[in-house]
A protein has these predicted regions:
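Conserved donor-binding loop and adjoining core beta-sheet/short helix segment
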Residues: 19-100, 208, 216-227
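Flexible, substrate/cofactor-facing loop regions flanked by secondary structure
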Residues: 24, 32-36, 150-227
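Acyl-donor-binding surface of acyltransferase catalytic domains
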Residues: 68-71, 83-152, 294-296
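Conserved active-site alpha-helix within GNAT-family acetyltransferase domains
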Residues: 115-133, 243, 247, 271-289
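C-terminal "cap" of GNAT-fold acetyltransferases
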Residues: 136-155, 263, 268-274, 289-301
Length: 301
């Protein structure tokens, strides 16, 4: 059996595998390497139980991570393999090991996100998955930011060390009930603010007076031309929905990313979320591709 459970001796070689497959050039290798090591250490993952490694003759050929979201009875499985493993029996075994782990935890569904060109969707359908959502990859690369002034009484500021409870509350209030969102704990939020691909200056709050209206969480990811800034999350708390504040939150995140010297800004959005898609298109974002979410309902649910 080429699939084994993660052990601590895998840490460096596995991070090297992920970094070498994620970074198109050496400039951003270190970012990919350190970010994946951060992923392995995040609260609640327990990598020795929920990370599976595909090996051949001691060489890493793939990895699968099982993120358990007990609050919504869901597991999110992330899979990466060498290109030559695509559609192979070994890749199938890797996926099945991850699904079996989710089943053993009594979770209701397993979700896996794939790029259409990867061909992994067909493999997932062989083992009971079906496509349930399409997300759009969007990109903004214009020369000038949109000209937008904050409404009177509103202000923007970055995350500060005392803000973990505030960020946890705002994010959970903004997204609870949204497809695929599992409420976060303060421990999880604090850890993620310290990830290598995150800057606390790039986590932004929008306030009306002293009341939080929403937030934007930006991150850095590898891209063909180097590092790309990404609008990771834009959340509006329920009492501010329908007031047009999401455009100002988006603008704050874009302004921060451009201030760091990044020329490209990306984001992902649920294709079913027509208001959000419309906002991004009107701001100048263009659709560059898709990501397909597959779901398998697990036994006993």
């Amino acid at each position: 059996m080429p699939v084994v459970n993660y052990t601590n001796h895998h840490n460096t070689v596995l991070a090297e595998f992920v970094a070498s497959h994620s970074s198109p050039n050496s400039e951003i290798y270190d970012l990919c390497f350190s970010t994946f090591q951060g992923v392995l250490g995040q609260p609640g993952l327990d990598a020795t139980e929920n990370c599976f490694v595909l090996e051949r003759a001691g060489v890493v050929k793939g990895v699968a991570l099982v993120f358990r979201e007990f609050a919504i009875s869901r597991s999110v499985i992330e899979v990466m393999t060498d290109p030559e493993q695509s559609g192979s029996l070994d890749e199938l075994e890797l996926v099945q090991c991850a699904v079996a782990r989710a089943e053993a935890e009594g979770l209701g569904v397993a979700h896996i996100c794939v790029l259409p060109e990867s061909g992994r969707g067909g493999l997932l359908e062989q083992v009971g998955f079906s496509q349930v959502r399409t997300y759009l990859d969007m990109l903004w690369d214009q020369d000038e930011l949109p000209d937008l002034e904050l409404p009177q009484g509103y202000s923007v500021r970055s995350f500060q060390s005392r803000d973990t409870p505030l960020l946890t509350r705002v994010q959970n209030d903004a997204f609870t009930g949204s497809w695929g969102f599992s409420p976060n704990t303060e421990e999880q939020i604090e850890y993620r603010t310290q990830m290598p691909n995150t800057s606390k200056s790039g986590i932004l709050f929008l306030f009306e007076g002293d009341r939080p209206a929403g937030h934007c969480w930006t991150v850095m990811v590898p891209a063909e031309n180097g590092v790309r800034g990404v609008i990771g999350m834009i959340g509006v708390v329920p009492e501010y929905r329908g007031k047009g504040v999401s455009r100002h939150i988006l603008h704050a995140g874009m302004k921060y990313l451009r201030s760091t010297g990044l020329s490209e800004i990306g984001l992902e959005v649920d294709g079913n979320n027509e208001p959000a898609v419309g906002l991004y298109k009107s701001t100048g974002f263009k659709t560059m591709g898709e990501r397909h979410w597959f779901e398998r309902v697990l036994p006993g649910t």
